[in-house]
């Protein structure tokens, strides 16, 4: 069970048939866990026994600050658990191409290259931010012996102002990290990884270097 949680925590941190819609707008979403102010939803994913997940929670920082944390891909090795390697291959105004390798120790390392597409728009009390990513392994390093190459890793972060100094964060993900075992176990353990992700981002958002000036 620990190895499933570790893998999920990583792929979450890097890291569509992904939607940032409210749970009430799609009857397929079902609440599966609530912990530490984070509500996690799941729904079936066509053609797979694995499920898509969406988590909604509040972060005590502005949306701009939280986005700076998520945008700090180069720094993931210092605050995203188990991240062994993370580098930017290409950064443009509205996208990032990044290679990431995660090392949960209890199974072999996993790696992938992602293309993250970024956008923002004005809303009440500031800007909302949306980052969406999908695999782009063909634009990254070749597969390495002994490292499992992840080919399914799609997700998004939606960050919305939620009052003074607060952000409503919606994280969505569908991934297959290549771990064997019953699908229901992998789906259950995924919720643990998502909670770890929120905890890491909440903690990092307190770092003064990300604060809005």
Segments and roles (model prediction):
Residues 1-10:
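Bacterial N-terminal signal peptides that target proteins for export
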Residues 12-20:
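Hydrophobic h-region of N-terminal signal peptides that target proteins for export
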